[in-house]
Amino acid sequence: MNSNDPTAWFTRGTESYLKKEYSAAIADFAEAIRLNPDYAEAYRARAIAYEQENRLADAVADYSAMLLVQPDNPTAYYSRGNCYFSLGRYDAAIADHTVAIEFDPSDSLAHVHRGNAYRAKGDRHRALADYNQAILLDQNDALAYRQRATLYQEIGEVEKASADFRVAERVAQRAFPTEG
């Protein structure tokens, strides 16, 4: 391996990651970044490895560094938003998912995750609006139906919750059929 080649370090880090050797992957991605501080993909890969080790603050830092290199990357906003959510930083999660949605308004998952952050903050109206939008965008999004069902359950709309849980189950069965 050429020790001065950031791509070689990135490749080795990817191989370590695939073997679930996350600490080794993190070290290799760090070396790739040291050799090329603008290596956006290495920041993303290291952030994902940090997530596997539940080092979410480190993952947030790497997604932020990636955004300095690629400010128009909706995936970085989406992923950082998910980390913020897991850290309980709901306003930051909402902000990042909003940016991701601005880049790609048809991203149903970004709507679901922003809805989750709104729900965690107690803003059920905005959460419901996001879940509804996710379902409008992708009627095969079982997660959106489950999240909306859970919200309906929380607000005492039992019939709507039951209906959404049934739809989520049907959608999931179509997506992942079982042998019978």
What are these regions (language model features)?
Residues M1-G180:
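Alpha-helical tetratricopeptide repeat
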